[in-house]
Design a protein with these regions (language model features):
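Cleavable N-terminal export/targeting peptides
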Residues: 1-40
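Residues that define the transmembrane beta-barrel architecture of outer-membrane proteins
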Residues: 41, 61-67, 92, 118-124, ...
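Outer-membrane beta-barrel pore domains and translocons
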Residues: 48-52, 83, 101-103, 140-144, ...
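Extracytoplasmic loops and strand-loop junctions of Gram-negative outer membrane beta-barrel proteins
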Residues: 49-52, 109-111, 140-141, 195-202, ...
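Outer-membrane beta-barrel "beta-signal"
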Residues: 66-70, 158, 250-263
């Protein structure tokens, strides 16, 4: 079994970012219809599904059931992008937080015969969200800390929520990520034993920018509690990582749909 991590794909990371930004936009939309400063506390829970490659660069797709979660209670948060943790700084323009987040890999049946699977782990994450001029900029970093995890991934994104009307919010986003050599080799590498068993060429991953994504997220508020969220986008691998024998397509589209309830 490989001893290094695979984090959430950039596809799912971007979806989580857009969903969080959309919730904040809903807060803004609601505040325009109310008096005084609304509380940031919220509990949003739902269920969705992502249509995404079985791993980054794969030819095959899978439908992956996913929770839709965005909880803020005081300094505590739990959401799809940043995991579970505490907001250390939280005001209108800047949020800085830290927590732990799952770091999933890929199944043995999803990769060529002879290539090991990557098992789940847990990573420590820190992030900062900066809001200004209607744009939400996010910087984050995740380090594997438990299980068979290891390696470091940094990510950055820009989102621009647009309130079309009280019911519809669209959020275009772009994102990119950088990974160290340990992560790159763990996810995209093929060692000598795997090469002999699979017939693939050996490949050793090195540190560098890993991918870039573009996403369009749409939220439709069914009523004051229920909302429907849909996302469509694409992720492209960058640089040397495209030379990995595991990569069949450098650019792959993806989608996400969820129904959520706000308590």
């Amino acid at each position: 079994m490989k001893s290094t991590i695979a984090r959430w794909s950039m596809t799912l990371l971007a979806m989580g970012a857009a969903a969080q930004v959309a919730v904040k936009a809903q807060d803004l939309s609601s505040s325009r219809q109310s008096v005084g400063q609304p509380s940031k506390d919220r509990i949003v829970i739902g269920l969705g599904a992502a249509v995404t490659p079985v791993y980054q660069g794969a030819d095959d797709y899978r439908v992956l059931p996913l929770p839709a979660i965005d909880i803020v209670e005081g300094r505590f948060f739990a959401n799809f992008r940043n995991g579970v943790g505490l907001n250390l700084v939280d005001d209108r323009a800047l949020t800085i937080g830290a927590g732990v987040t799952p770091m999933p890999g890929y199944r043995r049946r999803d990769v060529p015969t002879g290539v090991d699977r990557l098992s789940w782990g847990v990573g420590g994450r820190v992030f900062a969200n900066l809001t200004g001029g209607g744009v939400v900029a996010t910087l984050g970093a995740t380090q594997g800390i438990t299980g068979s995890t290891g390696g470091f991934v940094a990510d950055a994104s820009l989102s621009y929520p647009i309130i079309l009307n009280p019911k519809v919010i669209i959020t275009p986003s772009i994102a990119t990520s950088f990974a160290d050599g340990k992560h790159m080799d763990g996810y995209f590498g093929v060692n000598a034993r795997e090469a002999a068993a699979s017939g693939l060429d050996q490949y050793r991953g090195k540190a560098g920018f890993k991918d870039v994504s573009a996403l369009l997220n749409i939220v439709y508020r069914l009523d004051s509690r229920w909302s429907l969220t849909g996302s469509v986008g694409a992720t492209s691998l960058l640089g040397r990582v495209k030379d990995s024998p595991l990569v069949e397509h450098a650019t792959r589209p993806n989608g996400f749909l969820a129904l959520a309830y706000r308590f």
